[in-house]
């Protein structure tokens, strides 16, 4: 399976929901009109035409905070590019020049032993009952949308 190929299926889709801030802190939930969605749990930045306009550490006040207002700007926008790099960082660009850059947390080799079974971000394809989890230890695991997160995940290799 090629993760970038899977993600690129969202190019041309509209973002129908994009939320962060408030009780969600800086976690982002972004839904596409094809039913797929992404959730992020790590540091992110939003740029407009290459200029930084918000980061995950900005004001997370519900509705009115910079995080909430900025992430809502993605709603009703068409995805023009989406990809991951070799470090499994995620990049989503929409038609009006907004770009979401999701940077995975970096860990020292010694820290890897202390990591739990947590993800930095995940990508769900409900039509295929598939969730791909980008884990803190730089692995990718697959689960089912219809299964509880506590069910065992399958380690997968990506092209």
Name each model feature, range by range.
Residues 1-159:
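Surface-exposed, interaction-prone regions used to assemble/regulate multi-protein complexes
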């Amino acid at each position: 399976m090629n993760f970038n190929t899977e993600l690129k299926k969202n190019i041309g889709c509209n973002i129908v929901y994009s939320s962060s801030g408030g009780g969600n802190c800086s976690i982002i939930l972004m839904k596409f009109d094809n039913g797929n969605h992404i959730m992020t749990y790590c540091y992110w930045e939003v740029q407009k035409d290459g200029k930084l306009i918000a980061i995950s550490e900005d004001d997370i006040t519900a509705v009115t905070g910079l995080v909430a207002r900025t992430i809502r700007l993605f709603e009703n926008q068409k995805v023009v590019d989406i990809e991951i790099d070799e470090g499994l960082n995620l990049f989503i660009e929409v038609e009006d020049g907004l770009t979401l850059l999701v940077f995975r947390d970096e860990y020292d080799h010694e820290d890897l032993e202390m990591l739990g079974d947590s993800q930095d971000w995940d990508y769900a394809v409900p039509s295929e009952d598939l969730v791909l989890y980008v884990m803190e230890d730089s692995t990718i695991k697959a689960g089912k949308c219809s299964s509880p997160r506590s069910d065992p995940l399958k380690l997968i290799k990506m092209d």
